[in-house]
Design a protein with these regions (language model features):
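TPR-repeat structural position
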Residues: 23-24, 182, 458, 492, ...
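Alpha-solenoid helical-repeat scaffolds
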Residues: 327-506, 511, 518
């Protein structure tokens, strides 16, 4: 008996052959699969497909001509794929080696070969009782493990699910999504397209998300099912697809963001850093953490301890169950005597986008504690960690966020995760898929590109912008985004070109001028940078930070007196601004005015405010160049090694010898070892 993994390879190879119109090869693979599946109905289907294809080949080889042969090919491929998936499913059920087969077998024990009448009868009889949750789980398993549908079943299940309450609808729609994920079923996808018109926003968001992800998974097959593509015709989905795209990108960024936060925390040098520096690093990391949560990034995606330890989530159907506080096992939590605590829990869930599986796991963890004080403390901590997740979020966005986060957790952490392919394995950038482009408007495309750029995926955003520029008239906004892509890819000259064009279309746009300033500074084109800074100064004559940049630019152009006069002007308005004092010292040093540099550095160090990270480096450079090595070493000692090594370039620009930098490195290392 061939093992399931080998049979899955045979199935995939046969499917690939059929999709490439290598029909004889695909039928050969299907025949190999059928040897493990002695089902007479499927054997007859295979024989009919083979006979039809043989007759077609014979007819054409004899000089026959059939203008509909392409349609016949598509029909035969479609029938062969249907037979292939049906055979693979029956083999899987017969082996009883995984959760899918086990769920189907439990239904068989209850209702025989067709358990639907039994389960539906139980459902009707148990309305309004606590037992209905168990039957609801059976309904889920029934839909999850159901064979491929025909049109009659699509209509029947649509009618049944549509008349259930919103929570039940969500649960059963989830079962249909999971079933279609196991095996491609065009009728189930048509069902999802129909139920996506629901007036219930939660059901609509779930259905549309599942449908889009399934279409992405089965994109190579879509040309054989034209009815699936026409199901979208005339429907205005751009706004909802934009919300979905946003959440899909955020979900992709979640693992990277979570890892980055962990690395930031691990990178804090508690041994060599001062308490103020440690506090500064921790505060900066936590600020970034909260900013990511507000943005919608699922920062705790990989922290799944509660999910893995949950007894409730050991059942597959519970991963797709919308949160329902009426479930019997939750009653102890929500009807405790201390009603304030229960109300607080409701408020937490009501005003957060925390997905259903998280809520169930949180409640289960709380129920394991008998100490109400402990529960209150946990509740406060949990609320503080997730309350920002919905700040300024619109309701529709909340629904899509909860759905995407829930589904992502299912395919990453559920007991079924290792037994089925994730719906997130496909490319989830919607504009890259031709069949979805007609549904996306310009705004959706631009927002997608903005998000990709924001998360440093500019290499993905730029081709989309190029494609959009060929389809529509080029705007200043589009050019700005294209310039930003080139900027982030380090193509500074190309970035200047795009920003310059944007400036021509939308003259004196502040953001565009700021980016040109950055590019010219990087390219050391100081004359052009000065022109841009002067244009910005006209817009904001009292901007002292802009004056600092102007002084820096003038210094590079050798206009030392003008640069220092500007810095002195800034000092008049900010006499004790630590950044201003350090900048004056640093600029004076670069201009060769060591006396001025020494004066302003002493003035800065006399202030009680602790040195910030960049300020510490500037102060160390000044101390070093004016010959105060010991003071410079004290400043350099707590900095990370990579930060110190990066100081080579600015110090060299200030005239500090390369060999002296090597000495400085060894002296710093000795000082760190002594500490």
């Amino acid at each position: 008996m061939t093992d399931l993994s080998t049979l899955n390879v045979i199935r995939q190879q046969a499917a690939d052959a059929l999709l490439s119109y290598r029909i004889s090869e695909g039928l050969f693979g299907l025949e190999a699969l059928m040897r493990e599946c002695p089902d007479q109905q499927l054997s007859n289907a295979l024989e009919n497909i083979r006979d039809s294809y043989t007759q077609m080949l014979h007819f054409l080889s004899q000089g026959g001509h059939d203008e509909e042969r392409a349609d016949i090919q598509d029909r035969l491929v479609r029938q062969a794929l249907h037979t292939l998936d049906s055979a693979a499913r029956l083999i899987r059920l017969s082996r009883r080696e995984d959760l899918y087969a086990h769920a189907h077998y439990q239904l068989f024990l209850l209702g025989g070969q067709d358990a639907a009448p039994y389960v539906l009868q139980q459902w009707d009889a148990q309305q309004g009782t606590a037992e209905r949750y168990e039957t609801q789980d059976l309904l889920f398993d029934l839909l999850w493990t159901t064979p491929l549908w025909d049109q009659r079943q699509t209509a029947s299940w649509f009618e049944f699910i549509s008349r259930q309450d919103t929570l039940v609808q969500q649960h059963l729609v989830g079962a249909v999504i999971l079933s279609a994920c196991e095996y491609m079923d065009a009728e189930k996808l048509i069902f999802l397209s129909l139920i996506a018109d629901s007036e219930q926003p939660e059901v609509r968001a779930l259905s549309l998300t599942g449908l889009v992800l399934l279409l992405l998974k089965y994109e190579p097959r879509l040309s054989f099912y034209p009815a699936l593509l026409t199901a979208f015709e005339g429907r205005k989905l751009a706004d909802e697809l934009s919300l979905l795209q946003r959440e899909l990108i955020l979900m992709q960024e979640s693992p990277k963001a979570s890892q980055a936060i962990a690395q930031e925390m691990a990178g804090i040098d508690f041994v060599h850093s001062t308490p103020q520096q440690v506090e500064e690093r921790i505060r900066a990391t936590m600020k970034r953490y909260r900013a990511l949560i507000v943005e919608g990034v699922d920062i705790d995606f990989h922290k799944a301890t509660l999910l893995h330890s949950s007894q409730f989530l050991r059942r597959i159907s519970h991963w797709w169950a919308p949160f329902d506080e009426s479930r019997p096992f939750l009653q102890e939590l929500f009807i405790r005597k201390d009603g304030d605590m229960a109300e607080g829990l409701r408020q937490m869930f009501q005003h957060s986008a925390d997905c259903s599986v998280n809520r169930y796991a949180i409640c289960e963890a709380m129920l394991s504690h008998s100490d109400v004080t402990s529960i209150d403390k946990q509740l406060t901590q949990l609320w503080e960690s997730i309350e920002a997740n919905l700040t300024d979020a619109i309701p529709q966005q909340v629904y899509f966020r909860s759905v995407v986060q829930n589904m992502a957790r299912f395919f990453a952490h559920s007991p079924l995760a290792q037994q089925t392919e994730s719906l997130f394995a496909s490319d989830t950038c919607l504009p890259r898929h031709a069949f979805l482009r007609p549904l996306l408007n310009r705004q959706t495309m631009m927002q997608t590109c903005q998000m990709l750029i924001h998360f440093h995926r500019e290499a993905e955003a730029f081709p989309l912008l190029q494609q959009l520029s060929r389809q529509e008239s080029v705007s200043a906004e589009m050019l700005r985004l294209m310039g930003r892509c080139q900027q982030q890819m380090g193509q500074w000259q190309k970035a200047v070109s795009f920003f310059t064009q944007a400036d021509l279309l939308d003259e004196n746009d502040t953001w565009t001028l700021q980016q040109l300033n950055v590019c010219y500074e990087r390219l050391q084109r100081h004359a052009e940078r000065l022109d841009v800074l002067q244009r910005l100064e006209v817009q904001a004559p009292d901007d002292l930070d802009l004056s600092l940049q102007l002084a820096d630019c003038l210094a590079h152009l050798g206009r030392a007196d003008e640069a220092l006069n500007l810095l002195y002007k800034v000092e008049l308005y900010r006499p004790e601004d630590v950044t201003v004092l350090t900048t004056i010292a640093h600029s004076a040093l670069r201009l060769g005015r060591t006396d001025v540099a020494r004066k302003y550095m002493q003035k800065r160090l006399s202030l009680s405010a602790p040195l910030q990270s960049e300020e510490t480096l500037m102060a160390a450079r000044v101390q070093l160049v004016i010959g105060r090595w010991r003071e410079a070493l004290q400043l350099y000692a707590p900095t990370p090694d990579e930060t110190f090594e990066a100081e080579r370039e600015p110090l060299t620009a200030l005239g500090f010898p390369e060999k002296d930098f090597a000495l400085l490195r060894d002296m710093r290392q000795q000082l760190r070892e002594k500490k």
